[in-house]
A protein has these predicted regions:
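Hydrophobic alpha-helical transmembrane segments in integral membrane proteins
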Residues: 39-50
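N-terminal mature ectodomain segment of secretory-pathway/periplasmic proteins
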Residues: 80-161
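Membrane-helix boundary connector in multi-pass membrane proteins
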Residues: 9-25
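Hydrophobic membrane-insertion alpha-helices, especially the h-region
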Residues: 29-39
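Central hydrophobic cores of alpha-helical transmembrane segments
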Residues: 2-10, 27-29
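Gly/Pro-enriched, hydrophobic low-complexity segments
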Residues: 208-273
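Flexible, processing/modification-adjacent segments and terminal tails
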Residues: 156-213, 244
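N-terminal leader/targeting segments and the immediate start of mature chains
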Residues: 48-98
Length: 273
């Protein structure tokens, strides 16, 4: 906002005192457009920040306790092994997480583009707040995906000003429920004792899960290796929103690393088949 005011004052001085005012005006126009875009992106992001702040205040009022081996006894053996491998036993139960991503994505048949994102998940009442800044054709395209109160919305705007996509509805709710459960499996395995999950054993290296959040019901099959690592998550309940078509969705994991004494996924992919 300060930059916008400065440009306006500069333009007044240019018009009043400079014979070749058009050259200064062009420079001011460029600065003004950049300042407006920066302000618009910050304003667009403010809803994300406000939502995060609100959920953090609720979470802080919730007392925590430890996740023990007794808590995981009802889970299928490969899921128990995964939780032990992850290092979450005898640690505080997870109430929320913050995830920062650097990556690339693309729509089917289109070119890759880079993105950076910040994401908060809250697990007592499943919530996912995901803010992304993508760069397409040299332009910044921010997007806010939120899943709150069992309802999902996606809002993408060029420079935070011009609508590119706005999606909501039953398909969006179901698709984001898959994403929320995928986050639980990959990013917060301690939450896999959640009572909303119904586990179905398959064999020593795979298990099926049904996850229900209100009217949103999804399922997925989790695949593990002999070490206990979760190596893939496959669901047939994920939609590609811009097409509103249901595709098989998988997230193969190819690398783990140790962070604060826990084995955490370090590299993975999200694939629509």
């Amino acid at each position: 906002m300060v930059a916008i005011i400065a440009v306006v004052l500069s333009q007044i001085l240019i018009i009043g005192s400079w014979r070749d005012a058009k050259f200064g005006s062009i420079a001011n126009l460029i600065v003004l457009l950049v300042a407006i875009a920066a302000w618009a992106i910050q304003h667009f992001e403010s809803q994300f920040r406000n939502d995060v702040r609100s959920h953090l205040q609720i979470t802080k009022a919730t007392p925590g306790d430890l996740l023990t081996e007794a808590d995981i006894q009802s889970l299928p053996q490969p899921v128990q092994k995964y939780l032990k491998y992850s290092g979450v036993i005898n640690r505080p139960r997870v109430k929320n997480i913050r995830i920062v991503f650097d990556g690339e994505m693309r729509s089917k048949g289109k070119d890759w583009f880079p993105f950076q994102s910040v994401q908060y998940n809250f697990f007592d009442d499943p919530t996912r707040l995901f803010f992304m800044k993508a760069r397409m054709f040299g332009m910044v395209v921010p997007g806010y995906h939120d899943y709150q109160d069992k309802t999902a919305r996606m809002n993408i705007k060029l420079f935070g000003l011009f609508p590119v996509m706005h999606a909501k509805g039953p398909e969006m709710n179901k698709a984001e429920t898959v994403t929320v459960f995928n986050d639980m499996c990959l990013m917060a395995p301690a939450t896999l004792i959640d009572k909303r999950i119904q586990w179905v054993p398959i064999d020593n290296t795979s298990s099926k899960a049904h996850f229900t959040n209100g009217m949103n019901k999804i399922s997925a099959i989790l695949y593990f290796n002999e070490k206990g690592e979760l190596v893939n998550f496959i669901s047939d309940d994920r939609y590609v929103i811009d097409e509103m078509k249901q595709y098989r969705f998988s997230t193969p994991v190819k690398e783990y690393k140790v962070i604060n004494g826990m084995n955490v996924m370090a590299y993975g992919e999200a694939v629509w088949h």
